[in-house]
Amino acid sequence: VWAFDLSADAMARVVAGGGAAAASAVDAATGADVIVTMLPAGSHVKAAYEGQLFSAAQPHAVLIDCSTIDVATAKALGEAAAARGLAMVDAPVSGGTAAADAGTLTFMVGGPDAAFEKARPILEKMGKAVIHAGG
């Protein structure tokens, strides 16, 4: 698992847990089968995917955005991913940091059925409830 975060503390926890620290988001995403993002706002998510991550994604990659963002941005990014032949879901979380630490997050997932089925096994490892809320 390759990871990138602006927080040195977060990256230290990744490395301590057996992951590898990447120098940038695109370095973490290049060659990955799964790309998971969790960013502060829709503008950050849009900039990350349109700026680098769509290009870095493998044709078979599953893109999972766990940010809590506006519906219009999530739909536009899903359409942009589909136009590139990529599977993408919008999967905001509920449960806070305690649930994240315990692996008991709840994911409310939006996206096409096929993309959801590709993302489901990954999300099930990260949380206790994975709910497909539609496409």
Regions found by a protein language model. Name each.
Residues 19-24:
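Conserved SAM-binding strand-loop segment of SAM-dependent methyltransferases
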Residues 8-10, 28, 95:
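Conserved beta-strand edge residues that scaffold enzyme active sites
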Residues 1-17:
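NAD(P)-binding Rossmann-fold cofactor-contacting core
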Residues 4, 38, 91:
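The conserved SAM/SAH-binding core of class I Rossmann-like methyltransferase domains
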Residues 10-13, 45, 98-101:
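A short acidic, helix-capping loop that chelates divalent metal ions and anchors anionic groups
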Residues 48, 68-135:
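Rossmann-fold dinucleotide-binding core
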Residues 25-87:
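Rossmann-fold NAD(P) dinucleotide-binding segment
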Residues 6-7, 41, 112:
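Residues in the short beta-alpha loop(s) of Rossmann-like NAD(P)-binding domains
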